[in-house]
Amino acid sequence: MVSLMGTLLFLSLRGLHVLLAAVWVGSMAFTSYLLMPVLQGLGPVGGHVMIGLNSKGMTRFIALISGMTVLTGIYLFWHFTGGFDPEISRSHAGRAFGIGGFAGLIAAIVSRAIVGRSAEKVARIMEQASMVPDGPQKGELMQTATLLRQRVATFSTVVLAFQVIALILMAIGHYV
């Protein structure tokens, strides 16, 4: 019975890990290649869209998905290596999963620390700018928001690159 429960837990967490990773990678691909270019082209209106996304919890959603992906991945690596056995970790498959996991961890950190925080700052600045009359102060706020949106766009692409590395290494891990 313990073996069956362990197998069911492993398979459930593996399925959850793949599902979470798919949602996370898809979200970042959408953000990098569709959403951010459109928002940058909209100028000040793009900031209002970011306010809406922030109020709906987009940054919290991405943080939750990335965190759960990393945590389930750590469990899967622990399971694969028999409790982080160094010999298994040094195997080709262990290295592929380990490097892929590290790339995923970097993606999660950059996603939250840079992309998420910058997106939240844009939303706060745009809310502030909406209450300021046209003039130099509003211009400075809009310029800051534009720079932060560019940071979100740039680092969303960086996150996606690390996710692709993780995705490829996870896909080939059992076959190397």
Question: Locations of the language-model features?
Answer:
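Polytopic transmembrane helical bundles with strong interfacial aromatic enrichment
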Residues: 1-176
